[in-house]
């Protein structure tokens, strides 16, 4: 156990909620950090607030970073179509938001250093890094090197460390751990479509629903699931 502080990037989804809960389980005082970046699925921000309250986080902050200003992703540009045919492992999907995680992690590290936090907790996992370049282990290792070189705390040898506890986990493993930890999964939000009810057909809904079915909880699946 530890009395140290951790900053958890909290999207409002299942993965980040589970990572934050694992940080709490490890004894960290957790501060949640969410981002309004112009995403079409802004409902996830409401979910992040609900999860922060459910987990009794020490603090929760939402930062405005308008990445929709220049688009480049189906998550920030409504002219682009969301993928619904299954996750592509050979190409980077159009749900990739240019530079998003680089921006988020940089801001998270700024808050971590300002607050003297020991960890920056990320919910990236094996499903993410199969498609997204900024969720892969080599990216996280490189960013850690950058953080150690670019911050006063890092240069002094006590800078915050990136912690991605789910990085090797499947979505089913994450769902099972979330259930074990008592996370209110029904309050999390994964759907990319931007409505008030999960669509059940976007890739994010599909992956989540498959994991929940495998974990034995069909009652938590999207209402719109085919």
UniProtKB/Swiss-Prot annotation:
The keyword Iron does not apply. It comes from the Bacteria. It catalyses: 7-carboxy-7-deazaguanine + NH4(+) + ATP = 7-cyano-7-deazaguanine + ADP + phosphate + H2O + H(+). Zn(2+) binds at residues 191, 199, 202, 205. SUPFAM superfamilies: Adenine nucleotide alpha hydrolases-like. ATP binds at residues 10-20. It is an enzyme of class 6 (ligase). Its cofactor is Zn(2+). Pfam families: QueC (PF06508). Keywords: ATP-binding, Ligase, Metal-binding, Nucleotide-binding, Queuosine biosynthesis, Zinc. One of its GO terms (biological process) is queuosine biosynthetic process. Its EC number is 6.3.4.20. One of its GO terms (molecular function) is ATP binding. Binds 1 zinc ion per subunit. Pathway: Purine metabolism; 7-cyano-7-deazaguanine biosynthesis. Catalyzes the ATP-dependent conversion of 7-carboxy-7-deazaguanine (CDG) to 7-cyano-7-deazaguanine (preQ(0)). HAMAP family: QueC. Belongs to the QueC family. This is 7-cyano-7-deazaguanine synthase. It comes from Synechococcus sp. (strain CC9311). The gene is queC.
